[in-house]
């Protein structure tokens, strides 16, 4: 089977574990023996002794390996900041959806939503929203983004 492994500060890596590989063995294989394994879209880490198959991790699944069980994400827009606690395998798309929503977010109009994206604070990087929040977390299990106008390339 093929599994896409996401980790903090690294590009996505393709691994070929057996379905009988445990979450602990996968964490060991990627060089993070003390880390937790999260299936994309799940809030709770896979139990270390669970096999990938038993945990519902199938072929071509996306998992995140992280020492953090939760990431504190802050999103800044118009001199205001909203914070959320999410699992490391949460996608930036899910954070973006909360940040632009009414109630939990900044209540952007549909027109404004289509023109904005997340940008890493202190940088010009506007990462693809399919990436995991945990890829951007620091050692304190926190990540910070600005809600900005999307870069538009014309050519």
Where are the regions a protein language model picked out?
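Ubiquitin system architectures
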Residues: 1-155
